[in-house]
Amino acid sequence: MEWTDEGIVLGVRRHGESSAIVELLTRGHGRHLGLVRGGAGSKLRPLLQPGNSVSAVWRARLDEHLGYYVLEGTRMRAAMLLASSHAVYGVTHLASLARLLPERDPQPEIYERLERTLDDFDDVGEAAVHVIRFELTMLAELGFGLDLANCAATGVTSDLIYVSPKSGGAVSRAAGEPWRDKLLRLPPFLREGSAQRNDWSDQDLQDGFLLTGRFLLRNVLEPRGQGHSDARDGFINAVVRLRTRELAETAPPK
């Protein structure tokens, strides 16, 4: 058995004296593990960092075997990602989410979303938007997608600003007003047709994390006996800290 694919490094663990088991999210073969000979050595260490993109050749005698990887770097992001606290936390959090996917099940939309997210970590606010959208996509792939296209109460498709915490359906301003204190807020960047960069406020980011965090916890993590990772909390805190600093630096002098 042999195949060649694109992949993103999710994690690595030592195996024996010199080898390592590498976990990739691949474009065409899903989340897939393989043994890399010499993977525990210093020569391959820079390549096998989470967030790097690689060209992967996988070989095994039988399809169900662990198999061996031969990897070549195609986009070495790790050095840039390790240079900022929000990116370090973000990559760790994204990898932990990707591990919720079943092994060897192709998830091309998740792969492309992860790739776009990793390529845009230099902008703190946009990185936060990407992570929230990644969480939303993960919910859909795991069978718990939110219905944000129309109002769950009336069916209208405009002025959707709330989400029901029970059903996960969008709610319009008019229909939700009597229960506004019990509804979650739907940030503009998650509404249909919103794709502009920097089309968000810091409150929008907080609303987005609260929204996806609630449904991830209730529908995905708690049934597995898990909670939100420390990396997710660290990422959110780093974003808040860096955004506060950015706003202070750009504020006009008093």
Swiss-Prot record:
The keyword DNA repair applies. SUPFAM superfamilies: ArfGap/RecO-like zinc finger, Nucleic acid-binding proteins. Keywords: DNA damage, DNA recombination, DNA repair. InterPro entries: ARFGAP/RecO, DNA_rep/recomb_RecO_N, NA-bd_OB-fold, RecO, RecO_C. It comes from the Bacteria. Gene3D superfamilies: Nucleic acid-binding proteins, Recombination protein O, C-terminal domain. It holds the Pfam family RecO_C. Transmembrane segments: none annotated. One of its GO terms (cellular component) is bacterial nucleoid. One of its GO terms (biological process) is double-strand break repair. Involved in DNA repair and RecF pathway recombination. Belongs to the RecO family. This is DNA repair protein RecO. It comes from Rhodopseudomonas palustris (strain BisB18). The lineage of its organism: Bacteria, Pseudomonadati, Pseudomonadota, Alphaproteobacteria, Hyphomicrobiales. The gene is recO.
